[in-house]
């Protein structure tokens, strides 16, 4: 059975005032709790990238670790984590970025990717784009052939794609737009 994108959107839980007052949080975990929704989401994302020659799916901690390995398996690719500092055991590279309330940093293993890799960089949600932009910069330091960027949800009103306007070589797509 094919579920519409509208049904997927309706199944996303909205949590007001989380993590701070005034924020409406879109909880994508409701898409994962039922096998039909999870399969539909997996199928849609697979169809988006099945002909792109993806060799590595890179997921951003932590919700990028849910669909990332599923996509990697479906695409016949490896999975690479991007994590917060101090969580990866071997030699890493890092990229820092500004957030609305301070700075943050993401890291990847130095040997995670190479110039032959076609990368699908995945996270659950595009809001302001800061985390993904830092992750994309980090991945590009390892010189892959091509970088695709994917989100389950894009919050259109926050214009997160705008931080990528100078990255003409990066293909950015989302499954659902809110």
From Swiss-Prot:
Signal peptide: none annotated. One of its GO terms (molecular function) is adenine phosphoribosyltransferase activity. Its main location: cytoplasm. GO terms for biological process: adenine salvage; AMP salvage; purine ribonucleoside salvage. The keyword Repeat does not apply. It is found in: Cytoplasm. Pathway: Purine metabolism; AMP biosynthesis via salvage pathway; AMP from adenine: step 1/1. Its EC number is 2.4.2.7. It catalyses: AMP + diphosphate = 5-phospho-alpha-D-ribose 1-diphosphate + adenine. Keywords: Cytoplasm, Glycosyltransferase, Purine salvage, Transferase. HAMAP family: Aden_phosphoribosyltr. Catalyzes a salvage reaction resulting in the formation of AMP, that is energically less costly than de novo synthesis. Belongs to the purine/pyrimidine phosphoribosyltransferase family. NCBIfam families: apt, PRK02304.1-3, PRK02304.1-5. This is Adenine phosphoribosyltransferase.
């Amino acid at each position: 059975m094919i579920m519409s994108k509208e049904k997927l959107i309706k199944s996303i839980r909205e949590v007001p005032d989380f993590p701070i007052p005034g924020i409406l949080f879109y909880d994508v975990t409701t898409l994962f709790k039922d096998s039909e929704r999870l399969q539909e989401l997996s199928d849609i994302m697979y169809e988006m990238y099945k002909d792109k020659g993806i060799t590595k799916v890179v997921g951003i901690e932590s919700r990028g670790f849910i669909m990332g390995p599923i996509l990697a398996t479906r695409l016949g690719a490896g999975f690479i984590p991007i994590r917060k500092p101090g969580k990866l055991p071997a030699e890493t590279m890092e990229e820092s970025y500004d957030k609305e309330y301070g700075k943050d940093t993401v890291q990847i293993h130095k040997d995670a990717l190479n110039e032959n890799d076609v990368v699908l960089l995945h996270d659950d949600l595009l809001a302001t784009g800061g985390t993904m932009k830092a992750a994309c910069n980090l991945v590009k330091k390892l010189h892959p052939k091509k970088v695709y960027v994917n989100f389950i949800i894009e919050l259109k009103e926050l214009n997160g794609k705008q931080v990528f306007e100078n990255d003409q070589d990066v293909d950015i797509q989302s499954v659902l737009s809110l």
